[in-house]
């Protein structure tokens, strides 16, 4: 496998971290996931990711020189330097994801908001192929959104251009109760279903 070039893709979620090994033409070679360790405000998440990628490189007998880098989607605003300033779902405050991953893996790391990079992926290889303007909504532990305009991600003034999950939708409820994420995320649906079951509905 050393002659061909590869890259890794990582989607960090509040429940699980999904990873993929890709050939440099975008072909998926293998995918897997690991649980998201939220202990100690997510302090072990990046080292868990690095360890899993290193294990995969060893399993495949790959030379490190055959890996172009790793792309990482984070469920929160990310600035142009790959720094996350707050990520509620993971318990992170300001975290330099790019610098930390590059130090752990000795590989280039490219970091973006998860919904933004998902929207970009849909434009290149998914349901948005052939379109240069699109909006993508992601539903998981929270609700996210990615906006592509003229083929480019709309980042907004603070990296939260598509963060529709934090829109306040109900004026009579305090944050975060009035947020879209609170009302529509899969985690809220599970809580509501569990509450309904326990009350005999």
Feature locations, PLM:
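Short glycine-rich, Thr/Ser-proximal phosphate-binding strand/loop in the N-terminal lobe
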Residues: 2-51, 83-85, 159
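Short glycine-rich anion-binding loops that position phosphate/pyrophosphate groups of nucleotides
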Residues: 15, 75-77, 140-142
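Short glycine/serine/threonine-rich phosphate/pyrophosphate-binding segments
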Residues: 16-18, 117-119, 142-144
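Glycine-rich phosphate-binding loop and adjoining helix at the ATP-binding site
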Residues: 38, 42-51, 58, 65-70, ...
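A short alpha-helix-loop-beta-strand transition element characteristic
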Residues: 64-65, 156
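Glycine/GP-enriched mid-protein hinge/lid loop-to-helix segment characteristic of carbohydrate kinases
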Residues: 2-4, 20-22, 30-32, 41-42, ...
């Amino acid at each position: 496998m050393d002659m061909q070039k590869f890259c890794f893709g990582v989607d960090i979620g509040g429940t699980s971290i999904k990873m993929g090994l890709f050939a440099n033409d975008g072909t998926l070679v293998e995918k897997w996931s690991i649980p998201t360790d939220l202990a100690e405000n997510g302090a072990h998440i990046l080292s868990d990711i690095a360890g899993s990628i290193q294990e995969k490189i060893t399993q495949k007998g790959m030379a490190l020189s055959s890996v172009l880098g790793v792309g990482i989607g984070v469920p929160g605003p990310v600035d142009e330097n790959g720094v996350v300033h707050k990520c509620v779902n993971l318990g992170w405050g300001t975290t330099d994801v790019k610098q930390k991953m590059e130090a752990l893996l000795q590989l280039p790391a490219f970091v973006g908001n998860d919904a933004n990079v998902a929207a970009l992926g849909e434009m290149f290889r998914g349901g948005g192929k052939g379109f240069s303007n699109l909006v993508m909504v992601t539903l998981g532990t929270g609700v996210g959104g990615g906006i592509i305009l003229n083929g480019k991600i709309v980042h907004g003034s603070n990296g939260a251009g598509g963060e529709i999950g934090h829109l306040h939708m109900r004026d009579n409820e305090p944050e975060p109760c009035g947020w879209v994420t609170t009302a529509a995320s899969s985690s809220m649906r599970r809580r509501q279903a569990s509450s309904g079951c326990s009350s005999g509905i």
